[in-house]
Amino acid sequence: MHKNDAMLGDESIGNLIVKLSAPAIVGLLVQALYNLVDTIFVGRGLGEESMLAIAGISVAFPIQILMMAIALGVGIGGSSIISRALGKKDIIKAERTVANMVTLVVTVSIAFTALCMVFLDPMLKVFGASDIVLPFANEYTRYIVIGTTFFTFSAAMSNAIRAEGNTKFAMAIMLVSSITNIILDPLFIFEFGMGVKGAAIATVISQLVGCVMVAYYYASSMSRLDLIFAYMIPDTKILGETISIGMSEFIFNVVESALFLLFNQSLLIYGGDVSIAVFGITIKVFMLTLMPIIGIKQGIQPIFGYNYGANEYARVKKTISFSNYIVTAMCIISTVI
């Protein structure tokens, strides 16, 4: 029996939730912090144009949420299949799912990148870029979009790694990527004088580092699953199941992107570019309070999937009860803070 099988199937639910959620929470908090630091560096690096530059980054946020929709749609859909397959001891199905996740996320990301590059300026105007902010938004978003596949691949496959119960390595991917970004930001923005373009390039490089770490994970003996190229041939059954499970998360993020579009347009009309910049900063600060809750969600997913696949429904129900108590307590604490 693999050590993660014993952990997911036998260890107490309370200990499991803490053990699997804590690394996810740490990684997500650091990631949220680097997003905030990114904005701070841009604000300090562009002098009188800083608010326009921050507004440009804020306008790009709905597009980044769409990128997240792709990553989470594939990641959550595929990881659910993987954890249930591991619970049933069906290693081949788990490996086929990992390979098909790669195929799906890369294909969709390339299509998304091509679409955005063709219609970038019209999209940015729809998302709230004024004529003054548009050059900053374009300069930043162009590079972010070019790096779409790096981001979505790293984020989606981190979910697959988490599905094995290896939340520590998934955390390491987020930590190393975030720290890389924080180190590169001042270098590109201040030392090279590249402004918002430098911030975007630093972000893309950090996402590429995440991709390299995912590749290393599957190439080494760290994963219990092999990434087999022959399995990357699309399996319609696995792809269909991945899409059907991940669709709700995908739609949720698309709707969230649409809401930010409406917010930005309203702020542009009634408050101007500075209001959009302030709103963008506020959202990034607010995200720090949400990350622990999202971390709990990520931590309990492999517990759900594995025990559901193993027909241990009592443990599934217990996980739901424990996680509900923890999340409720976190929400109360966040509200008080």
Model-derived regions, located:
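Interhelical loop/hinge segments that connect adjacent transmembrane helices in multipass membrane
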Residues: 1-21, 203, 215-256
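Alpha-helical transmembrane segments of multi-pass membrane proteins
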Residues: 131-154, 240, 281-289
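Residue-level recognition of transmembrane alpha-helices
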Residues: 21, 28, 58-61, 105, ...
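Short membrane-interface helical motifs at transmembrane helix boundaries
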Residues: 111-142, 333-337
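Small-residue-rich hydrophobic transmembrane alpha-helices
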Residues: 54-114, 151-170, 278-336
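Signature of the first transmembrane helix
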Residues: 15-79, 247-268
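Helix-terminus/linker motif at the lipid-water interface of multi-pass membrane proteins
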Residues: 29, 33-54, 124-131, 187-194, ...
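Membrane-interface helix-loop junctions in multi-pass transport and translocation proteins
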Residues: 10, 178-212, 337
